[in-house]
Amino acid sequence: MRIDYTERMPQSYKMHSSMCLELKRLVDRIMRIFPDIEDARPGCSSGIQTLCLLHNALDKTKQLLQYCSESSKLYMAVTGDAILARGSRAKKSLEQCLNDIRSIVPTILEIKISQIVQDLRSTQLTLEFSEEEAGKAIRELMQKSTSSSASPDEIKDFHYAALKLQLSTPEAIVTERRSLKIICEDHKQNSFTHHQSIDDSLHANAAEAEASEEHNGTLPEKFKCTLSRTVMYDPVIISSGNTFERMQIQKWFDEGNDSCPISKRKLDDFTLKPNVELKSQISEWCAKNGLDVQDPARKHVKASNSIDFSVSIASFGSSLYNIPDHSGISITDFNSSYSIDSSSYSKMSKGGYFTPMQRIDSASGAGDTDSSHSEIEIDPLCGLTNLPWDAQIKVVEDVRSRFEHSTRAFRSMSPSKFLEPLITYLKNALERNGTAGEIIKGGLDLLLAFLSGNRRAIESLEEEVFKMFSVFLESEVVAEEALNILEVLSNHPHGPSKITSSGSLSSLLKIVESQAEHLQEQAMITLKNLSSSMEICLEMVSLDFIQKLTSFLQQKVFCKHSIIILKNLCSTEKGRGCITETPDCLASIAELLESNVPEEQENAISILLQLCVQKIEYCCLVVREATDIYSSLILISNNGTEEVKVSASELLRALVEVDSDKEEEEEVSSRPEGRTTASPTSQVVTPVTHPEPVKITPSPKKSGLFGFNFSSLKKKKK
């Protein structure tokens, strides 16, 4: 019945990833101690039964995780509530089994189990909002229609759900079809037939719904944009599932609207995804019926010398509207033919440079900039590196000021098309001016805003970019801006390893040890985030950071961050050893037991408990270094928060049992001579005296406060 705790479980999940990752984390912790539970051999019938139940609960949880990594996204979206209930039942079963078994295992193992039980109780399993919305849309769709073919409205609803579930690429659709086929074969029922027909309609894209119109020469309504009532040249799908002409829906958003023009549903995601299949159908129909559809953006480009090219050059180079070059003149030709003077810079700084829907008056050729400029601009830095240096500075400042309070707009921008020119700009600024001046500050502020609004862009940052941040940390001028960026990066799964490999860790430690108070706390927050990585913890220990953390605790500064970092360092064997060997470290940690901040108390107890669980020698050191630890723990057990009470009681029990074992060993060693003697080479342990505990009515299980045996706290009567 022994479980192979090295068994691999899925690392990624198609759906309900937040719930699955929480369950996987808990299962991993249980499987690591399961061999120890088996070795404890709970011999009673109830113990064996509980062990079997725990085995079954683990198997069911792992089956759920495997299911969420392999099954159909659509099916899991529809049955999301059932899957959540299944996960909650699995968590409850694990909690119940561990709670029953911890009373029949040794104390050290009981403490480990208690920590897992506490974590199980505090863990809340939830579904992602987008998945709930997609499931709701599909369920409503399945209830609306019972016919074999889907109507256009149903297709729109399905597009909305498919976008939410990221079923927008051919590869994703093929994988989904295979998963659906497996489910249909397993169920052997007709209840899923309608769901399968909806999936097929994704590929047909409602072609059947309007087949008659296409064959009789009548222009299908689906080819027309709802906003312009004209045939679409570049159809795009928005997050509501409806399709529009790219230029028209972009204009709709530019005017400040944040809802779908058809469904009136408020949108959080303003991404525009090309409807390739519909465009292909439109092209085929137009070719068959002799209709020529013109690009609606052509009327916005006039190949005339009267145009103010300082305003139009950015939109000319942008790929957002696919503006054709009728004059055959390249961007380089424009740069060489038309100089950008100071008046052009002033127009850029006023926001006229990157307005995406630039309207040009046909009579005067002057640019008419909409006052309510877009929040969803695409590639605003396109062509940045082709401009003169002074113009680049103006452009970066213009974009920074425009999006300063609207980082949501960055979600729809391409990371590569935004980051590449901006990183190149920062490198050039570093080569031209070093780390001095406001030029780099503006670039770093813009980079921070972009990474904060578009977190997926962090994955595309190369290691050389992180090395550049390390250089900026060494500068007093831009260190604060670099720290702001590193704090964001340290919170991302792909950030910590690259930060460490770039050498920024030592720079952060230098800032912490410096006298720059305005930077110290921010550096501590970043280090706290980085300490969640075990590899970085080992490097922090090697750099002797624990001594600095100890001094912070003694000085009562940055205690909140310091104790969390120490807690993370304590998760490694090297960190535990260094904490016990660093002078005054244990005493400083124990002093936080008297803190008025529950979080600091809880983290301090967690560190001491981790140490006591690992080695008896650590328990002895805790008792020796931490004065009045017993009275502090008793006080917390009575007056602390519920979570702190549990941890304090467990730590108290561990310390008391170690003291009891020591007394028994001393008694046995003293019996042959009739009195206690100590050899010259033996270690002399100074007895720690504590006040007599309050006597209470003994429980059937154990005597003493909270069921603990406090004989070790009393003086032995000879």
UniProtKB/Swiss-Prot annotation:
Residues 676-686 have a biased composition (Polar residues). GO terms for molecular function: ubiquitin-protein transferase activity. ARM repeats lie at residues 493-532, 534-571, 573-613. Residues 218-292 form the U-box domain. Pathway: Protein modification; protein ubiquitination. The keyword Hydrolase does not apply. Pfam families: U-box. It comes from Arabidopsis thaliana. This is U-box domain-containing protein 5. It catalyses: S-ubiquitinyl-[E2 ubiquitin-conjugating enzyme]-L-cysteine + [acceptor protein]-L-lysine = [E2 ubiquitin-conjugating enzyme]-L-cysteine + N(6)-ubiquitinyl-[acceptor protein]-L-lysine. Keywords: Repeat, Transferase, Ubl conjugation pathway. Residues 662-704 are annotated as: Disordered. The keyword Transferase applies. Functions as an E3 ubiquitin ligase. One of its GO terms (biological process) is protein ubiquitination. The lineage of its organism: Eukaryota, Viridiplantae, Streptophyta, Embryophyta, Tracheophyta. PANTHER family: U BOX DOMAIN-CONTAINING, U-BOX DOMAIN-CONTAINING PROTEIN 5. Its EC number is 2.3.2.27.
